[in-house]
Amino acid sequence: MAGNSIGQHFRVTTFGESHGIALGCIVDGCPPGLEITEADLQTDLDRRRPGTSRYTTQRREPDEVKILSGVFEGQTTGTSIGLMIENTDQRSKDYSDIKDKFRPGHADYTYHQKYGVRDYRGGGRSSARETAMRVAAGAIAKKYLKDEFGVEIRAYLSQMGDVSIDKVDWNEIENNAFFCPDADKVEAFDQLIRDLKKEGDSIGAKIQVVATNVPVGLGEPVFDRLDADIAHALMSINAVKGVEIGDGFDVVNQKGSDHRDTLSPEGFGSNHAGGILGGISTGQEIVANIALKPTSSITVPGETITKEGEPTQLITKGRHDPCVGIRAVPIAEAMLAIVVMDHLLRHRGQNHGVKTETPKI
């Protein structure tokens, strides 16, 4: 079956293409009684929206979301929530040159080989434009988690190219176009993007996403471990090539005596595991990092082939992000929120009455 849905109890299904009439999604499983408006969803959509700064694509889409169903008089009804965003700034002529060519590093070749037909306009379904609906659905999950359980999910850009942050100030993230928590690194990020634009090239990035106040006990071993589902969700984001939970690949250099998160009546002594043990949340912060590749939509000529298999060169035209990691910050938040929301509802349904003699730390 086509992989257009994620989640079990809180299930999100998206549809639409980059240059199609509209994007949409269906959200199933949201409990009734959640106060929600289009404005609540728009806040996160505006953070992801293209054309909002000189550092991202200049495609200007208002990304105004419409709630089609599942909400009555400002409250969720418990039925399917239908959401839609109309596409308004398509420039399909920019892609006429790739109608019969495959952009190297993109999904053009694989989509063509799999389906036998390809919407070449902006990448069609493979475009990151699809993630607008993930952000809209994730905003519902974020609001429910915060209102009902005090769970907060936030993310930031921690590295772009060879420029890494040195500190994290959560209050600084919304003060700059990079979602950067280190004010001292904003200028370096700015200069890096300027240089890339002159070169017609792009760069990769790293994002950290954190969930706080997550209850202990979320996760369904063995195949639906919480960290497994988080990795699945984050890896489904366009351009993501790596996911780390907690210390991630740094554990290779750690000893067991250093890595283990010791316990005491006052709590855990560390959080190397990223808030998940045995696939189940510990009650600590859930911490994940994702690595995003540099986009291949650049003006530097590259070798490729035509649909007939003939060698050719290609320069990608159109409006593209020099670093896709910038606008991926709210997308990462949305995907983590969807997973945590799904597992919270699953846990509540099966384990609501479970009590132990051990106090929660």
Curated annotation (Swiss-Prot):
This reaction introduces a second double bond into the aromatic ring system. GO terms for molecular function: chorismate synthase activity; FMN binding. FMN binds at R125, S126, S127, N238, A239, G278, K293, P294, T295, S296, S297, R319. It is an enzyme of class 4 (lyase). CDD domains: Chorismate_synthase. This is Chorismate synthase. SUPFAM superfamilies: Chorismate synthase, AroC. Gene3D superfamilies: Chorismate synthase AroC. Pfam families: Chorismate_synt (PF01264). Its EC number is 4.2.3.5.
